[in-house]
Regions:
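Juxtamembrane/disordered regions of integral membrane proteins
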Residues: 1-139
Protein backbone atom coordinates (compact mmCIF):
# COMPACT_ATOMS: atom_id res chain seq x y z
CA UNK A 1 0.00 0.00 0.00
CA UNK A 2 1.40 3.39 -0.88
CA UNK A 3 2.07 6.03 1.73
CA UNK A 4 -0.80 8.37 0.93
CA UNK A 5 -3.30 5.52 0.84
CA UNK A 6 -2.03 4.25 4.20
CA UNK A 7 -2.27 7.71 5.78
CA UNK A 8 -5.37 9.35 4.33
CA UNK A 9 -8.07 7.53 6.30
CA UNK A 10 -6.33 7.71 9.69
CA UNK A 11 -5.42 11.32 8.93
CA UNK A 12 -9.06 12.12 8.20
CA UNK A 13 -10.20 10.37 11.36
CA UNK A 14 -7.61 12.17 13.46
CA UNK A 15 -8.44 15.47 11.75
CA UNK A 16 -12.15 15.20 12.52
CA UNK A 17 -11.49 14.19 16.13
CA UNK A 18 -8.97 17.02 16.47
CA UNK A 19 -11.63 19.54 15.38
CA UNK A 20 -13.60 18.60 18.49
CA UNK A 21 -10.45 18.58 20.62
CA UNK A 22 -9.64 22.04 19.29
CA UNK A 23 -13.11 23.23 20.21
CA UNK A 24 -12.53 21.88 23.73
CA UNK A 25 -9.14 23.58 24.16
CA UNK A 26 -9.68 26.87 22.33
CA UNK A 27 -13.46 27.21 22.47
CA UNK A 28 -14.01 26.07 26.03
CA UNK A 29 -10.89 25.95 28.24
CA UNK A 30 -8.90 28.93 26.92
CA UNK A 31 -11.51 31.06 25.09
CA UNK A 32 -12.14 33.43 28.00
CA UNK A 33 -8.52 34.66 27.79
CA UNK A 34 -9.15 36.04 24.32
CA UNK A 35 -11.21 38.78 25.97
CA UNK A 36 -7.98 40.23 27.38
CA UNK A 37 -6.95 41.30 23.86
CA UNK A 38 -10.20 41.89 21.91
CA UNK A 39 -8.48 44.06 19.27
CA UNK A 40 -6.41 41.03 18.19
CA UNK A 41 -9.30 38.81 17.16
CA UNK A 42 -11.47 38.89 14.06
CA UNK A 43 -15.21 38.27 14.39
CA UNK A 44 -16.01 34.54 14.43
CA UNK A 45 -18.53 32.90 12.17
CA UNK A 46 -19.33 29.80 10.12
CA UNK A 47 -16.77 30.65 7.42
CA UNK A 48 -13.98 30.93 10.03
CA UNK A 49 -14.98 27.62 11.59
CA UNK A 50 -15.11 25.85 8.22
CA UNK A 51 -11.70 27.16 7.14
CA UNK A 52 -10.03 26.35 10.45
CA UNK A 53 -11.58 22.86 10.36
CA UNK A 54 -10.20 22.33 6.86
CA UNK A 55 -6.74 23.44 8.00
CA UNK A 56 -6.96 21.06 10.95
CA UNK A 57 -7.94 18.05 8.81
CA UNK A 58 -5.29 18.75 6.16
CA UNK A 59 -2.65 19.15 8.87
CA UNK A 60 -3.62 15.84 10.47
CA UNK A 61 -3.38 14.12 7.07
CA UNK A 62 0.04 15.69 6.45
CA UNK A 63 1.30 14.56 9.86
CA UNK A 64 -0.05 11.06 9.17
CA UNK A 65 1.76 10.93 5.81
CA UNK A 66 5.04 12.01 7.41
CA UNK A 67 4.64 9.46 10.19
CA UNK A 68 3.96 6.63 7.71
CA UNK A 69 7.04 7.62 5.70
CA UNK A 70 9.28 7.64 8.76
CA UNK A 71 7.83 4.44 10.24
CA UNK A 72 8.18 2.57 6.94
CA UNK A 73 11.88 3.40 6.81
CA UNK A 74 12.16 1.91 10.30
CA UNK A 75 13.79 4.95 11.85
CA UNK A 76 14.34 3.20 15.16
CA UNK A 77 13.50 6.12 17.44
CA UNK A 78 10.13 6.58 15.72
CA UNK A 79 9.35 3.02 14.58
CA UNK A 80 9.06 1.61 18.11
CA UNK A 81 5.31 0.97 18.25
CA UNK A 82 2.94 3.43 19.88
CA UNK A 83 5.82 4.96 21.85
CA UNK A 84 7.59 5.73 18.58
CA UNK A 85 4.41 7.26 17.17
CA UNK A 86 4.12 9.53 20.20
CA UNK A 87 7.80 10.46 19.91
CA UNK A 88 7.19 11.45 16.30
CA UNK A 89 4.16 13.51 17.32
CA UNK A 90 6.28 15.32 19.90
CA UNK A 91 9.07 15.94 17.37
CA UNK A 92 6.65 17.35 14.78
CA UNK A 93 5.02 19.51 17.42
CA UNK A 94 8.36 20.81 18.75
CA UNK A 95 9.68 21.45 15.23
CA UNK A 96 6.62 23.11 13.72
CA UNK A 97 3.54 23.94 15.75
CA UNK A 98 4.97 25.07 19.07
CA UNK A 99 7.52 27.53 17.62
CA UNK A 100 4.95 29.09 15.29
CA UNK A 101 2.47 29.72 18.11
CA UNK A 102 5.13 30.96 20.52
CA UNK A 103 6.87 33.20 17.98
CA UNK A 104 3.55 34.68 16.85
CA UNK A 105 2.87 35.65 20.46
CA UNK A 106 6.12 37.59 20.53
CA UNK A 107 4.82 39.95 17.83
CA UNK A 108 1.04 39.69 18.17
CA UNK A 109 -0.60 40.83 21.38
CA UNK A 110 -2.14 37.67 22.86
CA UNK A 111 -2.77 36.54 26.39
CA UNK A 112 -0.20 33.96 27.46
CA UNK A 113 -2.97 31.48 28.25
CA UNK A 114 -4.24 31.71 24.66
CA UNK A 115 -0.74 30.82 23.47
CA UNK A 116 -0.64 27.91 25.91
CA UNK A 117 -4.02 26.79 24.57
CA UNK A 118 -2.78 26.92 20.97
CA UNK A 119 0.33 24.94 21.86
CA UNK A 120 -1.69 22.27 23.70
CA UNK A 121 -4.26 22.24 20.89
CA UNK A 122 -1.64 21.48 18.22
CA UNK A 123 0.07 18.91 20.44
CA UNK A 124 -3.29 17.15 20.65
CA UNK A 125 -3.61 17.17 16.86
CA UNK A 126 -0.11 15.75 16.38
CA UNK A 127 -0.68 13.03 18.99
CA UNK A 128 -4.05 12.08 17.48
CA UNK A 129 -2.64 11.94 13.95
CA UNK A 130 0.30 9.72 14.90
CA UNK A 131 -1.59 7.48 17.33
CA UNK A 132 -4.55 6.87 15.00
CA UNK A 133 -2.17 6.24 12.09
CA UNK A 134 -0.14 3.76 14.12
CA UNK A 135 -3.25 1.84 15.18
CA UNK A 136 -4.65 1.93 11.63
CA UNK A 137 -1.45 0.72 9.95
CA UNK A 138 -0.68 -1.89 12.62
CA UNK A 139 -4.08 -3.56 12.16
Amino acid sequence: MNTLRAAIVPGLIAGVVSIFASWFWMGFVFHRYQRATPETWRPEGPRNYALSSLVRVLSAIAISVLYVLVARFHVSFFADGMVGALRFAAAIWIALAAPVAIEAAIYVRMHSMVVLGQVIDWLTTAVLACAVTFVWTAA
